């Protein structure tokens, strides 16, 4: 595979005199002339399941049918009604559609798309996926650090960032936070421009946008399209889907592709679309928006655009082999286009590129080569996650405050535990609460992967980082500190207020045990949450799991009395291991019958007077292994759950 054949973006490996990335002469020829994207006989089918559980049927649904066309440098709009297939076509062209059920060819300058096409091209999703707790500049720095080659110096990368900020008119808000639901940030238009800027960091020659005007008012939407028009004049091929643009936006289009029910209604110069529809008998009324007119024609819901048969015979040019009268409207329009001069001209031009279809193809969907190393990605992901943590006081500061308050409340309720029979119950109760509190506090870890799912999928597909870099980066910067710090605070507050065993070793064993419980529970939360799209579903599954685990923790029921066919469930209980370790740490060596000789006084034969007796009654071994086996079990569960979470992320469906 030669680099010249597959060049679709300005390369970053060389530098010119101004410090910005440069190119060789042959590569510049491709970049300067712009990238021409052609698509040949694109068909896309999906299998849809319907019916009830035992009567489910799988039906194959055709999303796109024999789509052909060419996208040249300029503004290339894909227009159509809801469900017409415009977003599907955009994803197919951008190599972001599930390859199963997909047929046809997409060529760049007559050559197959390279394996790293998704990294070389830019793709702006419909829902802006940027880190809201970071500033505009910090988001761009993250994109530059992971997508630009390491051969570029930090000074060159900063120059590139400043150039993009200036090009998109983000100078005034460059150091303002993008904003979240809790943090006031930039406007909707500035947020959309930030998303575009993230993709322009690599200076791609092809830029895809999925409905860039969604959620914007008419004035802001017009400003965004004017920006795209200005960018297209620099030689970029900009391809975007759009639903119903106003006329001031429509007149900016260079090329127009009309889709309905996955069929091609028109593909050609936007300025000639009205003339084409007039030639087949559909005239646009004066002062009517052409985009609205096209949708009215496709949907067949406007009698104003349909001429009478007499008028059509007099004024309209009949295409070759017109469809029958009883043919559905979509089929009629598709047949009209197939027999039009626009389609024939497109086929002639497509034949000039079809030579690349005969070449040996390289899969677009195989693993790409990243421009940065694992450690470099890990460092930047950890840095961004830590900034995001500090920028979310509701998730970080609030959790610490709640931990302090809860520790003080528990310390007040169980203050200064006595070494008497009541002390046994109180100790068991408070240790059980500490264990279960660590479990339920870890439910918040489900948001770690669910909230950022769309961001992760977009950045991973775009070649920002590896799955392993993202996973371990989140663990280092978010999971570890947010589970370790509360455990330390909780232990320091409650241990001395409760008056637990006055031994330094016991203090640190309790702290370590609470940390292990928190890590194991959080790992379980990640294993459940990975791949989930809704936080409430993952939270519900976590809560139900912990409720069952609590039953087998050792407090609510004596585990020695559980029937054999259910007793095996205790080995899957995180609270059981934490509770057993805390009991061993606290009860061993304690005497709860002060003043009595437990070896000679028969009054204690039916009572528990020592911690050792209590532990034996609970089925806890008095050997040193009786303590550390719980930590080993928690560590094994943590490794297993983290492995499951990583595999679920790795196998997550990353195509739309």
UniProtKB/Swiss-Prot annotation:
Residues 37-286 form the ABC transporter domain. GO terms for biological process: biotin transport; lipid transport; renal urate salt excretion; riboflavin transport; transmembrane transport. GO terms for cellular component: apical plasma membrane; brush border membrane; membrane raft; mitochondrial membrane; plasma membrane. It comes from the Eukaryota. The keyword Amino-acid biosynthesis does not apply. Glycans are attached at residues 597, 601. CDD domains: ABCG_EPDR (cd03213). It holds the Pfam family ABC2_membrane. The keyword Transport applies. The chain crosses the membrane at residues 395-415, 430-450, 479-498, 508-530, 537-557, 632-652. It is a multi-pass membrane protein. GO terms for molecular function: ABC-type xenobiotic transporter activity; ATP binding; ATP hydrolysis activity; ATPase-coupled transmembrane transporter activity; biotin transmembrane transporter activity; efflux transmembrane transporter activity; riboflavin transmembrane transporter activity; urate transmembrane transporter activity. Keywords: ATP-binding, Cell membrane, Disulfide bond, Glycoprotein, Lipid transport, Membrane, Mitochondrion, Nucleotide-binding, Phosphoprotein, Translocase, Transmembrane, Transmembrane helix, Transport. Signal peptide: none annotated. The extracellular loop 3 (ECL3) is involved in binding porphyrins and transfer them to other carriers, probably albumin. This is Broad substrate specificity ATP-binding cassette transporter ABCG2. The gene is ABCG2.
